[in-house]
């Protein structure tokens, strides 16, 4: 089990890194804006995170078309060796994931809400897939069961590359703190 922090706050990242348990970070421009950061400085902020964190740093592209996502993904990946390009699980994102993964750029497909989406993400070349556990619960689904289904389905296939599941959007309840560790590789 690995623990990733979902934040753009450098103080939080440094604190968690000092505990010796932080395996990686996931972040996006919205989280960065909450720290007072400006979108045009997002890439520099990712560099600073990568200087703190040895493990993967998933940085989300805000581009919406295949070509824009690929361009942004290449720019993000060039920032540091441990950058993982975070891309929404949508048609344009799947196409961009295929292209980037063929270039050796690791991708985290985020906003995954179903087993078929997870399978498509893995087939497109995603290294990480992020099902949104808490958001399943928000729509009256059992998020932990959905997570278990995604993990079981992905583990059922050989995609020709490693795929890890990140339990994303985990809410602060006892069940959501303990249960993802039974299913996902990363929480």
Language model features with spans:
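Single conserved hydrophobic/aromatic residue that forms the stacking wall/gate
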Residues: 175-176, 183-187
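Glycine-rich beta-to-alpha transition loops that act as phosphate-gripper elements at the mouths
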Residues: 6-9, 63-67, 87-91, 109-115, ...
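Non-catalytic positions within long, well-ordered alpha-helices that form the structural scaffold/packing
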Residues: 17-18, 77, 122, 178
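Hydrophobic, well-structured mid-protein blocks that either form specific transmembrane helices
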Residues: 81, 85-129
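Surface-exposed amphipathic alpha-helices with a cationic face
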Residues: 50, 77, 94-104, 148-159
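Active-site beta->alpha loop and helix N-cap motifs at the rims of alpha/beta catalytic domains
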Residues: 4-5, 9-13, 19-22, 27-99
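Catalytic alpha/beta core domains of metabolic enzymes, predominantly
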Residues: 108, 115-178
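Short active-site oxyanion
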Residues: 1-3, 21, 82-84, 105-107, ...
């Amino acid at each position: 089990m690995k623990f990733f922090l979902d934040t753009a706050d450098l103080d939080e990242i440094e604190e968690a890194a000092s505990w010796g348990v932080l395996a990686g970070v996931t972040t996006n421009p919205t989280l960065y804006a909450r720290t007072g950061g400006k979108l045009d400085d997002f890439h520099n902020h990712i560099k600073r995170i990568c200087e703190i964190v040895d493990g993967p740093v998933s940085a989300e592209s805000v581009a919406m078309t295949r070509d824009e996502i690929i361009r942004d993904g290449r720019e993000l990946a060039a920032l540091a060796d441990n950058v993982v390009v975070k891309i929404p699980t949508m048609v344009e994102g799947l196409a961009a994931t295929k292209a980037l993964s063929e270039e050796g750029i690791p991708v985290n497909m985020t906003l995954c809400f179903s087993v078929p989406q997870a399978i498509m993400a893995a087939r497109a070349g995603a290294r990480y897939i992020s099902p949104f556990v808490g958001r399943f619960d928000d729509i009256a689904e059992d998020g932990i069961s959905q997570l278990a289904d995604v993990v079981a389905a992905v583990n059922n296939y050989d995609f020709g590359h490693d795929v890890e599941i990140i339990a994303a959007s985990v809410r602060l309840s006892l069940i959501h703190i303990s249960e993802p560790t039974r299913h996902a590789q990363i929480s």
